[in-house]
């Protein structure tokens, strides 16, 4: 999550959308007083037991959760900033995103669960990004960049915000196998149920072949 006062934008960092890399790139355009989750300390009222333990034993202060929701960010910055700044995020095909999540969270595990086993135990909120960029069930940002067209849409947003043209050039777009090769009917249906809002909002559909390269 980033709140940049100089360029008057708010970036809502979603899951499995190259959010950390985009946030790192955007952070180079920020200055003192801006809010960057990777470098901004969390308020003590947001601490979890583990945060208190690290503070007491190591003197380490917790950083902000990267995946702050739109509602949490609005509460932090206030209505005036929230309503006047350009707000954006990135969304990804739900089935593609689920496969990427599986790859990340099961890498190195032995034995490694199958994707069916992983999804059967996954919390629905871990599969859907919609709660992060909506408030009370309604879209709360000005632009949702489609991960399928990430490079072109990031460039367009950068131009809109007068950011340096080379800002996003170092970002690498991660590739996974096409989801139709690993998801069966049960897994497809589970993801459809968890991600129903974004599927309806953006018209996502289950594709049997890989789309063109980004």
Q: Which residue stretches match the model-derived regions?
A:
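Membrane-interface amphipathic segments in extracytoplasmic regions
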Residues: 1-214
């Amino acid at each position: 999550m980033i709140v940049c006062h100089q360029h008057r934008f708010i970036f809502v960092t979603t899951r499995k959308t190259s959010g950390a890399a985009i946030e790192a790139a955007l952070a180079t355009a920020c200055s003192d007083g801006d809010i960057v989750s990777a470098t901004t300390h969390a308020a003590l009222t947001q601490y979890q037991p583990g945060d208190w333990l690290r503070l007491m034993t190591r003197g380490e202060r917790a950083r902000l959760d990267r995946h702050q929701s739109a509602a949490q960010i609005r509460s932090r910055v206030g209505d005036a900033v929230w309503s006047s700044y350009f707000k954006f995020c990135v969304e990804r095909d739900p089935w593609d995103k689920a496969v990427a999540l599986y790859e990340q969270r099961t890498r190195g595990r032995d034995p490694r669960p199958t994707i069916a086993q992983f999804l059967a135990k996954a919390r629905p909120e871990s599969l859907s990004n919609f709660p992060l960029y909506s408030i009370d069930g309604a879209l709360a940002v000005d632009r949702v960049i489609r991960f399928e067209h990430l490079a072109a849409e990031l460039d367009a947003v950068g131009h809109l915000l007068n950011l340096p043209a080379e800002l996003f050039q170092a970002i690498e777009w991660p590739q996974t196998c096409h989801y139709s090769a690993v998801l069966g009917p049960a897994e497809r249906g589970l993801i459809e149920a968890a991600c129903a809002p974004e599927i309806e909002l953006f018209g996502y559909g289950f594709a049997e072949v890989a789309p063109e390269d980004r």
